[in-house]
């Protein structure tokens, strides 16, 4: 199972120890209990065995299960074992385990050293701050919970009834915009009525485009003129056109501003349109779309530079331009496999240019990472 694999990973980093045959038999029985989901039995055997590392390992595996343990136990484990793996998962479980029975003193002490990362954590922390009379801090956290949080239906109704006067209509729009970007459409639908009319119309158009339902043209026609160039609206129109293999998808990409949010999502759509354009034989247009990618860093930047270089090399036979893209890619990535890949393609471009010395230099860089 995955948990057995995780336990093996932890043990692999532990100091080498020699176990007696009895200890090994008990350890085997413990992990059989875990595989059978008999956690109480596994923890009893681990405690009885008296091996502190094994006991801690079994507790860690148990605490990783979602919603199974108390805030007190999880937070105590994190405090005692700050160097253990996957602590962010445990921190999230600790926050989700905070209940009405958890004292404000405990909640505030916890968040003094841990920034809230879950919806329940934000709500519990904000409410504890308000009860302590720390209104400015508390309202700030409550607003953040509303903007960033993902609530179940009943949880959302309770939260709104308690705190709806603590945030603004602008906060409602910030939340709605996020939910639409993230595809959380049921929650977005519930939030739509809390924003101004023009923004409701915009949100409705985005939602219909995302769902690929009827009435798209009607919804688009209703969008006010001053919102027609809203980047999120353009993104959904781009996705709709790309899914319907419309040639005019690239028109949206050609006119975009450079200061876009959600760059990775934009790149996914741009890359798909680039490949569609390439498949139709529009090679120069495909290259222009790829090379004007707007990406700044990370995996999407690397993919964009590679695709631009590949089109230049294989289709345009513009070897100098291809070499520039692959060199830029090499200079921007850090993982060995990425650097090896960039160097290999730079070598291919140098080979096409007939620059043998440069080609050999790039091939030498490519093989510096033998594990790739």
Tell what function each PLM region has:
Residues 122, 127, 131, 172, ...:
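Repeat-solenoid scaffold signature
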Residues 39, 71, 104, 135, ...:
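TPR-repeat structural position
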Residues 33, 98, 129, 179, ...:
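Residue at a conserved register position within TPR or TPR-like alpha-solenoid repeats
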Residues 1-23:
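Compositionally biased, proline/threonine/alanine/serine-rich low-complexity intrinsically disordered stretches
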Residues 26, 54-55, 59, 74, ...:
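TPR repeat positional signature
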Residues 12-19, 43-53, 63-67, 75-86, ...:
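Solenoid-like repeat scaffolds
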Residues 24-41, 174-179, 236, 240-243, ...:
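Alpha-helical segment of the N-proximal tetratricopeptide repeat
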């Amino acid at each position: 199972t995955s948990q057995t694999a995780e336990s093996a990973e932890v043990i692999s980093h532990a100091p080498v120890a020699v176990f007696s045959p009895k200890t090994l038999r008990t350890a085997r029985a413990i992990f059989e209990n875990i595989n059978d989901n008999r956690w109480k039995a596994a923890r009893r055997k681990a405690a009885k065995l008296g091996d502190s590392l094994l006991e801690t390992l079994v507790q860690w595996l148990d605490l990783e299960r979602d919603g199974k343990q108390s805030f007190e136990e999880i937070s105590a484990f994190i405090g005692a074992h700050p160097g253990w793996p996957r602590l962010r998962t445990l921190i999230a479980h600790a926050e989700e385990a905070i209940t009405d029975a958890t004292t404000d003193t405990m909640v505030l002490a916890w968040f003094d050293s841990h920034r809230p990362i879950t919806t329940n954590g934000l709500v519990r922390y904000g409410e504890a701050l308000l009860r302590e009379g720390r209104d400015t801090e508390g309202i700030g956290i409550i607003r953040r919970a509303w903007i960033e949080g993902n609530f179940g239906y009943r949880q959302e109704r309770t939260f709104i009834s308690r705190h709806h006067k603590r945030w603004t209509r602008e906060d409602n729009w910030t939340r709605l915009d996020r939910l639409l970007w993230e595809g959380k459409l049921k929650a977005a639908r519930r939030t739509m009525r809390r924003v101004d009319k023009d923004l409701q119309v915009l949100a409705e158009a985005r939602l219909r485009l995302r769902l690929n339902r009827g009435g798209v043209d009607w919804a688009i026609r209703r969008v006010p003129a001053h919102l027609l160039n809203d980047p999120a609206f353009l993104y959904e129109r781009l996705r709709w056109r790309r899914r319907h293999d419309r040639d005019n998808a690239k028109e949206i990409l050609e006119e975009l501003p450079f200061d876009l949010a959600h760059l990775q999502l934009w790149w996914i759509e741009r890359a798909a349109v680039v490949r569609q354009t390439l498949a139709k034989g529009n090679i120069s247009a495909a290259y222009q779309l790829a090379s004007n990618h707007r990406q700044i860093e990370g995996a999407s930047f690397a993919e964009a530079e590679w695709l631009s270089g590949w089109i230049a090399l294989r289709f345009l036979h513009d070897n100098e331009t291809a070499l520039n893209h692959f060199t830029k890619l090499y200079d921007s990535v850090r993982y060995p496999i990425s650097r090896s890949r960039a160097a290999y393609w730079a070598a291919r471009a140098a080979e096409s240019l007939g620059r043998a010395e440069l080609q050999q230099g790039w091939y030498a860089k490519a093989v510096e990472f033998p594990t790739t």
